[in-house]
């Protein structure tokens, strides 16, 4: 009798999983958007929470059977707020892109203008133009303007940005939102230097902390929400060592707009098992985050210097990497 093709495929999947695990056990991945969660986080991820649905907000669910899910989600929000010194946290977004979309949906309309870093300047595709298939433009219909950028210093030009915003206002293209953060940046963005200016034009400021969330949590980078950002979005699995997922932070005034944007706007049920994993990761970051973030930066600088010494051109040399 010929072997079942279904059985062959089934076995192949587990063979490939074993090969993958063996490969990565003997590798040092250098992909900035990846990290390894702790055994405790992984235990939460494989819990029965992954089989359940929980639309809505703790205490106000569409589904029954959410007693313990609600307890964990409330704890998760408490930990997120404590970790980032925020008054409000929505832990339901299933990715950093969905977190960004929640802010777009809450604080702008299709056709509004957002100013953001361009992709060559380190911006993320979720901040991008429609013609580049960027999430902000393609999905939410935002018109995107880019910050003037000093490539040599790897920084947004503050004076030129102020001038550009004034010119955009004259041309009836005043931004509704300003996005800081990105997917390739080594140094803090000038939130503090620009926030007062932007707020004189009633521009909502969001900081996409996806790649630096763990460094911010550990107090080793900038502190965007103390520097003037209204909201902060992130994924939870890069320098923050959690599961794949997203997070939106803000103050009390942002609670209702963000909650409505997340549900029912962008998600029905969220990934509840990953939410539990986020809670564990937030607790771990509160306990170990400062030392972890310091070691991440130390490792990166030493590695950059070593690469530079053997002839690689490494970004950020003039600023100490």
Task: List the predicted regions and their residue ranges.
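Conserved PLP-enzyme active-site core in the AAT-like
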Residues: 71, 75-311
